[in-house]
Amino acid sequence: MAKEIFKKQKPHINIGTIGHVDHGKTTLTAAITYVLAKNNQAKLKTYKEIDCAPEEIARGITIKTSHIEYETAVRHYAHIDCPGHADYIKNMITGAAQMDGAILVVSAVDGPMPQTKEHLLLAKQIGISNIIVFLNKIDLIDDNEILELVELETRELLDKYNFSSDTPIITGSALKALDNNLTSNIWVDKIYELLTALDSYIPLPKRDLDKPFLLAIEDIFSITGRGTVVTGKIERGSIKLGDTVTMLGFNISKNVVVIGLEMFQKTLEIGEAGDNVGILLRGIQKTEVKRGMILSKPLTMTLHSIFQADVYILTVAEGGREKPIFEGYCPQFYLYTINITGSIKFSSETKETGTKMILPGDRVKLNVTLIYSIAMEKGMRFAIREGGRTIGAGIITDIIK
């Protein structure tokens, strides 16, 4: 039986839930599908269906990023449910890098917590400028003053990371919205209020449709008898069946052919910038592909391992390290969906200033040498991490080798 064709009838937006572990991100995602399924605007997805991987169920936390589809009266959404546990921040980076906007879920019982802050920081670093807050579990709060304090604390946190002062904060209870036994469910209205805020507050992103095709690979699957499927968000350009694309990364460059294109298990005639797609490829084995590699229009991207960058090192107050950084320092660099070790040297400009070390809060020009050659270009942004935390952010200003 032929698969349903994905028809683009509304503007497409990538949205996602971020926030601390156990604050209700996955429950909220399930509640959104529950409410919209009544109007045939989503397929109902339970908490267990969203948290479907064995290791997720075993630990009771989200490890991978789950993609859910739904629509409102005016938009089509791809919703990414992001991990909240500190051990899996790198997967959160993969998911968040695909978002046009985010829903920050904060428990009214706990208030903002460590991962709340880190997720906001990461969102800012990877270019998410529009956030909506869902203050969850308010059914467990009897004192309005406590609720006001949590909202104030959340506003202060948004201000600290330079998010707008008019950021909507919706109060509600995702779990209560899922309760079938309530005769009058005011909590469902709160989900609609959240969706209305999404439609009105998150602007339609400008897609780079005219630039050469580029997709950063997030995941890889093998379909017996058919070939290898890669998934990810199209960063720019477009792609269709029969196109030849180049796979690049980890010292590998190879041309492959697109023989299948899907979005949410539906056949896609053409994939465009902003779409989260699955691409069936001919001419490559699953073992040859790694997360972090990219697909691009042939001859538009090349492999490099040494670049110059403008870098900002976070202060302790921003969640950064306390100690200074010296030449030879080897942290992890996160570019698109790849995380890779690299060593730093001071650029000639930095050396001319007499700099011997970099202190938290400094902005410097650095030369970075990665352990593998990867696809990169001027203007690419990256995060720098060590020991489970983000310690810096930068932008590539020149390719050296």
Curated annotation (Swiss-Prot):
EC numbers for this chain: 3.6.5.3
InterPro entries registered for this protein in UniProt: EF-Tu_GTP-bd, EF-Tu_GTPase, EFTu-like_2, EFTU_2, P-loop_NTPase, Small_GTP-bd, T_Tr_GTP-bd_dom, Transl_B-barrel_sf
Catalytic activity: GTP + H2O = GDP + phosphate + H(+)
UniProt-annotated location(s): Plastid, Apicoplast
Region of interest: G1: 19-26
SUPFAM superfamilies, sorted: EF-Tu/eEF-1alpha/eIF2-gamma C-terminal domain (SSF50465), P-loop containing nucleoside triphosphate hydrolases (SSF52540), Translation proteins (SSF50447)
Residue ranges of the region described as G2: 60-64
Residue ranges, annotated region (G5): 173-175
Binding residue positions for Mg(2+): 26
Top-level EC class: hydrolase
CDD domains: EF_Tu, EFTU_II, EFTU_III
Gene Ontology CC terms, in alphabetical order: apicoplast
Region described as G4: 136-139
Positions that bind GTP: 19-26, 81-85, 136-139
Residues annotated as domain tr-type G: 10-206
Chain spans, region G3: 81-84
UniProt-recorded Gene Ontology molecular function terms: GTP binding; GTPase activity; translation elongation factor activity
Source organism, top-level taxon: Eukaryota
Keywords of this entry: Apicoplast, Elongation factor, GTP-binding, Hydrolase, Magnesium, Metal-binding, Nucleotide-binding, Plastid, Protein biosynthesis
NCBIfam families hit by this protein: EF-Tu, PRK00049.1, PRK12735.1, PRK12736.1, small_GTP
Protein role: GTP hydrolase that promotes the GTP-dependent binding of aminoacyl-tRNA to the A-site of ribosomes during protein biosynthesis.
Family per record: Belongs to the TRAFAC class translation factor GTPase superfamily. Classic translation factor GTPase family. EF-Tu/EF-1A subfamily.
Complex and partners: Monomer.
Name of this chain's protein: Elongation factor Tu, apicoplast
Organismal lineage: Eukaryota, Sar, Alveolata, Apicomplexa, Conoidasida
